[in-house]
Regions:
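Interfacial loop/beta elements and low-complexity acidic/Ser/Thr-rich segments
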Residues: 1-127, 131, 135-149, 153-160
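Long C-terminal interaction/binding lobes of large macromolecular proteins
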Residues: 168, 173, 183
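A short secondary-structure junction motif
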Residues: 141, 148, 171, 175-178
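Residue-level detector of conserved catalytic or cofactor/ligand-binding positions
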Residues: 178-184
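Extended, charge-rich, solvent-exposed interface segments
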Residues: 160-170
């Protein structure tokens, strides 16, 4: 690590989620060292929120657009000098998990393949299936982060689709099969 890199790590930074994909619900912002200097700035755009994890604990959930000043125990030059025995690496880490506050609509779900059976009265083959769509809006980002995501870097609409399918489609398929057996 050169002198230029050490100097650059001492500067305050501006943190923001610039490239928000249309199907992305949660995103862990990658920073070079997670050693965010005191008085760095966090920018939250409309339709975004941010969970701040500092020293391993959720410290804040921000949902209003704006510019926020970050407070940390990492001070320019002083922290680096005090941690020279740890290769100048601070043990005070700050991570940012951005999330979409806008509603995500028209996420499709359905049975992977239809349930087939022979209709008893006319002896015709019938295929039954279920499908639909749903919308997702994150109401309690901290709860979702702690109970579902943990430190997952990215969480997409497709992940929600898989979760819904595993929890709803399988029981619905079993229900359709039970209806078929009742009618026979």
């Amino acid at each position: 690590m050169g002198l230029k890199d050490i100097f650059k790590r001492q500067l305050r930074t501006v943190i923001e989620w610039k490239e928000q994909k249309a199907n992305l619900l949660f995103h862990q912002l990658e920073t070079t060292t997670d050693e965010i200097k005191d008085a760095s700035k966090l920018i939250i755009a409309p339709g975004q929120g941010c969970i701040i994890v500092y020293d391993g604990q959720v410290r804040a959930t921000l949902t209003e657009p704006g510019v926020y000043e970050m407070e940390s125990d990492n001070h320019p030059f002083i922290t680096t000098l005090l941690n020279i025995s740890q290769q100048a690496e601070s043990d005070h880490k700050m991570r940012f998990y951005f999330f979409r506050t806008a509603e995500m609509v028209n996420i499709l779900w359905g049975t992977a393949s239809p349930v087939k059976y022979i209709e008893p009265d006319y002896q015709l083959p019938v295929a039954l299936g279920v499908c639909g769509n749903f919308s997702v809006k994150i109401q309690d980002a901290s709860q979702m982060f702690v109970t579902l995501l943990g430190t997952v870097a990215d969480y997409y609409a497709e992940d929600v689709q898989e979760l819904v399918s595993s929890r709803i489609v399988t029981p619905l398929t079993a229900f359709l099969l039970s209806l078929i057996h009742i009618s026979e």
